[in-house]
Structure formats: structure tokens, C-alpha cells
Amino acid sequence: MNERYFAVVAAIVLACSLVGAVVSATDESQQDESVADWSADVPDVHDVAEPPDDGVATLGDREFDSVQAAVDAAGPGDTIVLEGRFDERVTVDTPGVTLEALERDGAVIDGGEGGTVVEIVADDVTLEGVWIRNSGYDKNVDDSGVFVNGSNATLSALRVTDVAFGVWIGSVDGATVEDTIIAGREDVPTAQRGNGIHLWETTDAELTNNSITIVRDGIYYQWAEGVVAEGNTMWNMRYGVHYMYSNDNRLENNVAFDNDVGFALMVSSELTMRDNVAVNNDGTSGHGILLKDVEDSEIVGNELVGNDNGLFVYNALGNRLVDNLLLENDVGVHTTAGSSNELVAGNSFIRNGEAAFAETNSQLNWNGSERGNYWAEARTVDVDSDGIGDTRYRPAGTVERLVHERPQAAAFAESPAFDAVRMAESSFPVLESPGIVDQRPLADPPHDNWRDYYADHDH
């Protein structure tokens, strides 16, 4: 810390001694409300009756008691209809084949806890409505419910349970996974599980309306590009979504709740993350969204609620963090490790323990635009009623830095002495201490739906 910082701290301590033990006022409505019980509407992954009969695979006018036998007899473009229970592992090596259950969950393929249950090695294969379960346990050989090694595969309305990896898509293009339920093994520790959907050197995949739980990471990207993930729900795992070395991908309208981290975006660029929800992700790391070594990406319109850190920004450069709701997180935004050149505007910071915290030795000027962010605790004055505060706001200035480093000082957070320092920092550059500066704070929150998280715990 520099000498100026010590001088400011000394002034605060002296002022506090004069005003006595003044504690901050409490908003009783905030104390009485909590988002802790919020949950999304998710399926019971095991609430399904097992087909009672032995399996029958129908190919045209022929019937087989083995899926593999039917696949071996099929030609390109054929459809095989499945009903009942099959205890086997299947390899689909004929292009254009469709395997579909007579009704959803009306056919089970049980792998007997050995290896991958269904392996697709041909192009243009469709697998629909089938319950796939009991893969092997060996992550070193990628034991999976479904292993896709053929382009343009479509996996639709599957139930994939008690598996190491749910769906592994490796080095192929154009895969679709939609309306599918994936659940791993509850008796396997989280760190030892596979991922729900694992994308390896994959391009142009579409992942839509899937429900994923009890895995390590819900959707894992590794050198994957051009992937669209929309409408998926991930809960009870390490990371809901995890990017590594994966550029030019889009996440939209996904929900991640009750995980360690909702969305972990790492070592990637040109990502678009829009209109997603991250709630109550408060495990060891505890981030709604983690941006680590991410560049030139858009984080827009997301709702980050009840996490340890709503948004944790680590060595991230040149990103747009715009129009997000940050509600009731321990820290709204935590920025560190040289993150800079971010446009941060149009966000609503409401009822967070700390709105923002910056580990920096310099001043971060957010929003070089016509609007800033809404800070619920800012007491913004807008004399000309243009919606923009008349003075800048320091959400992470001298006082916030002191309280973060010396928690015992929180008792004086709303004292006249602390308010005087905030006013000086906001009104004119007398105290240009390190931290965050919002040059054009908003008078009203852009998000008028934030109370919905209290009114209805089922999203």
C-alpha cells in the first residue's frame, strides 16, 4: 500500500473515534428475504418405470432380440424400432441409420458396467427416445453412455444414467444433442466422475434443452468451436459449463444452479454468453460466472444470483460485461490479476454483500459509454432526471478495500467518516486511490424483475 492509502486509513480511524460506534442501518426486508431456496424446474432423473419385457428390435418386417444384430442387418437410411430391455453394448457403423424407441424410455440398453454402451462410428446416425445406462467406470478410456465418432449425429430425447461420461463427442462436426437427460453416479465422488457432455475438437455442435446432473462438469469444451448451447439446465456438479481453449462459441438461455461454479470460461476468446441464469453456486470456488484468461467476449443479459462471487474476472481483457443482474451475491464482481479494458455498463448491483472488489494497484474506469451501472447502495443523485447520476461512483474504492482487508471495519461502513471518504472520491479526484470508478452511475435499475427470485422459488 502507498503512503496516501495509509493516510486515508488513518483519517478514517480518527474520524470513527470521534463519531463513536455507529453501525450501518439494516434493511429489514432484505434480512427477511433470501434466494437460498430458489431452484429451477428440473426432471427427476430416475423417476421412470423400466420396460418389463425382453428387448425386440424391429427392422422392417424382421425382429431381432439384439440391437447389434439389427444394426448389422441394416442398410444406409434404415430405421430400427426398439422396445423392451437389451443387455448389451452396441456399435453403429452403418451411415444414416436411425435407432428409435417405440415410445420415450420404452427401450433400455444396459451396458452392464463395462465400457461404452453405444458407440457411433458412422456419419448421419440418429438415436432417439432410448434409455442408455450402466457404462463402465474407466475415465482413462472414456467409458460413456454414448460415444460419438461420426459426423452429423443426432441424439434426441435420450435418458443417460449411471455412466462415467454421458455423451462424448470426439473430433467430429455437426453433432446435435437435444431434449436429453444425463445423470452420473451418486456413489462416485465428484472429482472422479466424467462430464455430462464432453466436446473434444468438435465444431458446429448444437446442444439444446438438455438436463444434466451428478457429473463432474455439465458441458465440457476442449478445443471446440462454433458450438451453440441453448436452454440447458445443470445442477449438483462442479462446473455447469466449462470452456478450455475453445473459441467462437455461444451460450444462451442456460441455467446453472447449486454447483461449485455455474459457468467457467477459461483460456478462450470470442465467446458470446447471453441471457443465462446462475443461482446459488457457492462451493469451494463459488462463482456464478468465472472469466479466466478470456478475451474479446460478450457477457450480456445474464442473471447472477446468490453466488459467492457473481462474476469473478481473472486476467480477462477486452470483454463486454453488459446488462447483467447481480443480486444477493457475497461479492457482485471480483476483478483481479490484471483484468482490464472491459466495458462494464447497464448492470444492476442489488443486495450484494459487496457490490464490487478489485485487487489492483491502479484505477479501473468502467464504461467509457453514455451509461454506467446501477448500484443499489450508491444513493445516486439525479437532479436533471436524465437517468444518470450527477457524480461518479466508487463501488470499490478506499473504504471497500479497507473493509475487505479488515472485516472488523464493516461495523463503520455507513458511518459519517466513511461516507465523507466516499463523497470525496465520488465528487472530485482528491483521493485517486486504486479501485473501480463508475463515471456515469444509473439512477434506476435496468432490471425490474429482480424481485421474482424472492416471490417464486421455482424458476
What are the roles of these predicted feature ranges?
Residues 45, 49-83, 88-89:
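Acidic Gly/Asp/Thr-rich repetitive segments characteristic of extracellular carbohydrate-active
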Residues 126-226, 235:
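Right-handed parallel beta-helix
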Residues 32-52, 284-288, 328-338, 343-459:
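Functionally critical loop-and-helix segments that line ligand-binding/catalytic clefts
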Residues 80, 90, 97, 107, ...:
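Solenoid scaffold repeats with emphasis on beta-solenoid/beta-helix
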Residues 1-52, 56, 70, 99, ...:
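Secretory targeting signatures
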Residues 111-118, 139-147, 162-168, 189-199, ...:
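Extracellular beta-strand/beta-solenoid scaffold signature
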Residues 72, 87-100, 108-129, 133-153, ...:
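Extracellular beta-strand-rich solenoid/capping regions of secreted or surface-exposed proteins
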